[in-house]
Amino acid sequence: MMLIIGLGNPGKEYEHTRHNIGFIALENIAKQYETSFSVKKKFHCEIAESTNNGQKLIFVKPTTYMNLSGKSVIAVKTYYNIPLEKIFVIHDDIDLELGKIKFKTGGGNGGHNGLKSIDGIIGNNYHRIRIGVGRPQNSQDVADYVLNNFSKTEYVIAEQAIDKITDNFNLILENKLEEFKSKMV
C-alpha cells in the first residue's frame, strides 16, 4: 500500500496557483490509474484509490488548507496503517527554479507550512517530490507570490515538470527510488 499526497489549498480561487502544484501533479498521476477523487470528510480530504500490480494506491488532496495538511495525512495514515516509508508528498518549492524537480527522503521543511504541519504530526521521515515554482522577482511577499496563478509561460514549464513526474512515477511503484531521483534532474 502506498499513500501519495499532493499539497495545495481547496477552492476554485486557488486551483491554478503556484502553491497548488502538488494538487495539480497528483491529479495528473491519479488520472493514469483511472481513478477519480471524492470527498471523505472523516479524513479531511479528497481521496482516490486504485491498484497497480496488486499494490493499493491511495491518492490524497487535503481539504484543510495548506497549514493544516498534517491533520488529513495522519487521519489517512492511521486508518490504513501506512508506514512512513510508503508515504510520498508532492509540493511546491520556492527554493527551486521553476520546473526543477527534486526527490528526497526526510529533511527539513524549508519554511513550507504544509510540510511543517505534516512534520509536526508524523515526523519528517517520508518521501518528498519537490517541484520548483521559483521565488518572487521583486519585493513581492512570498505568501502572495505562491498564492498567485502561474503566468501562461510559467504554466507550460510547470506542466512539463508534472509530465516528467507522471511519466516516471512507475519507478516509485517499483521501489526504484534512486532511478526516479536520477530521472528528475
Swiss-Prot record:
Active site per database record: H19 (proton acceptor)
A Pfam family: Pept_tRNA_hydro
EC number from the UniProt entry: 3.1.1.29
Site (Discriminates between blocked and unblocked aminoacyl-tRNA) residue list: N9
Main location: cytoplasm
Keyword Cytoplasm among record annotations: yes
Compartments (UniProt record): Cytoplasm
GO molecular function, one term: peptidyl-tRNA hydrolase activity
Any single biological process term in GO: protein quality control for misfolded or incompletely synthesized proteins
Reaction equation(s) it catalyzes: an N-acyl-L-alpha-aminoacyl-tRNA + H2O = an N-acyl-L-amino acid + a tRNA + H(+)
Subunit organization: Monomer.
Family per similarity comment: Belongs to the PTH family.
Protein name, as recorded: Peptidyl-tRNA hydrolase
Gene coding for it: pth
